[in-house]
């Protein structure tokens, strides 16, 4: 979605319990040496005057399945799932949520997820996140057993000011820029090699030629929280 820069009245977008991209792969089981390769490039971006997301996302659940066993999954997201606007509001929503939603388990498998220059928010007046995130749950599952997991985030999940307004504000309440890269509700077991790399991400950036001081309001929130959320790792 693109609004021409010379048309300031163009582009007021509201996403309520919806997405731009949802469930590229929606299935039961991924098994028997399956090889899944998903690449998202220059997609699901919104360059508009104002964007309001309520209980929705730009991208949600690229993979939605019951289980993954004896298989390989590779996901690459680049220059996607970002927004630039005068005002940005996210309430109980995300730009990128549950890249992989695996209801039951991941077993004897290899998962490789790379996110580059994506899920970024560029604002020129105000940005507000309430109970939401820019990136949440790259992997959401119940159990990970005997699997190799590699996740790399580079220049992603950032909030960047790009205007010249004296009164610009960034407000983060009960939310995060990046939260729960792996959310495993039961256990991670059998010596799983898990590698998570975060580079130049989850930053609040002010680029202001007029030297206006931004107003930053961060309440009960974090920029980066819970790389792995799991009750048992053994």
Regions found by a protein language model. Name each.
Residues 1-234:
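Low-complexity repeat regions of mature extracellularly deployed or surface/particle-associated proteins
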